[in-house]
Amino acid sequence: MEEKNIHMQPNINYSYRNPNMYNMNYHNPIVPPPQQQMQLFVNDWKSILSPMQTCKIKQQFDDREFVADYFMGFKLDFNNKYLILDASTELMKFTACEKSEFCYRNCLPKICIPMNMKILSYGKEISKPDILMEKDCTCTFLCFNRPTIKMYDFSNNNNKELIGTIKTPYRCCSYNFNLFDPSNNKIMYMDDTCCQMSILCPCPWGPFKYSNFFLRDANSKEKIAHLRKEVPFLKFVKRDIDNYTLDFEQVQNPEWKMMLLAFALFLDYMYYDRK
């Protein structure tokens, strides 16, 4: 019998341990107390992310870099922090906190630096993140030894469960990212030109303000998600600060929505967070 290779699709909600959260037709014969239901809903990052159609990613301003740059003349780079908001309500849902060594950040090229980033739902402790993103230290040159981001679900008693990986093949005049599931099947990709006006000459007005990147399904090649980069007015004060709007469009699976969030953070880290 011929064995079928089934790939996880980003526009499908798959069954989880609590199927009643994602399937309105499912009836659970055992109903927990209301307190337990509320706690389960609040603490589960999938149930928070699942109904979101569009989110905003805002990089927080670090006044230490501003003081070091404009008053001391030093180009210092500190760990980034991002706020992730539901675009429809402007309410903060997640925060993303980067952790990398100070010497690595200020002495090595960004593409080579080992990186650790935690994504946690609003109100959670930094020691108990929902998602963990990891990038190893690599000696990267052009197409050799390209970096890979691994994303883990860390919400199950701090046990790491691989959700997917993000790889960035070398391209001369374009941004290329490939998103893979835990079985290393390519699910989505982005391949867009870097010759956009807002990239070549970033300014907070007119056609110089926005850059557009589109995620495509690996099989159909159709556009399934849209990432828009915005240049804020703080660009004049801190040159590497940017904001993003991520429209999930056809992506319904909360795990792949989180993968798209990780992709947006990785894109900013790799190409726009400059020393």
UniProtKB/Swiss-Prot annotation:
InterPro entries in the record, alphabetically?
Scramblase
The cofactors it requires, by name, are: Ca(2+); Mg(2+)
GO biological process terms on file:
adhesion of symbiont to host cell; plasma membrane phospholipid scrambling
Membrane spanning residue stretches? 256-272
Positions in coiled-coil regions: none
Identify the main location. membrane
Q: Which reaction does it catalyse?
A: a 1,2-diacyl-sn-glycero-3-phosphoethanolamine(in) = a 1,2-diacyl-sn-glycero-3-phosphoethanolamine(out)
Keyword Kinase among record annotations: no
Q: What happens when the gene is disrupted?
A: No defect in asexual blood stage growth.
The record lists its disulfide bonds as none
Localization of this protein:
Membrane; Cell membrane
A GO molecular function assigned to this protein is: magnesium ion binding
Keyword Disulfide bond included in the entry's annotation: no
A Pfam family matched by this chain, by name? Scramblase
Q: Which superkingdom is the protein from?
A: Eukaryota
Q: Which UniProt keywords apply?
A: Calcium, Cell membrane, Lipid transport, Magnesium, Membrane, Metal-binding, Transmembrane, Transmembrane helix, Transport
Q: Which GO terms describe its cellular component?
A: plasma membrane
What's the subunit arrangement here?
Forms homooligomers in the presence of calcium.
UniProt similarity note: Belongs to the phospholipid scramblase family.
**What is this protein for, i.e. what is its function?**
Catalyzes calcium-induced ATP-independent rapid bidirectional and non-specific movement of phospholipids (lipid scrambling or lipid flip-flop) between the inner and outer leaflet of the plasma membrane resulting in collapse of the phospholipid asymmetry. Preferentially, mediates calcium-dependent phosphatidylethanolamine externalization. During the liver stage, plays a role in the interaction with, and thus invasion of, host hepatocytes. Dispensable for host erythrocyte invasion and asexual parasite development.
Q: What is this protein called?
A: Phospholipid scramblase
- Which organism was this protein described from? Plasmodium falciparum (isolate 3D7)
Gene name tied to this protein: PLSCR
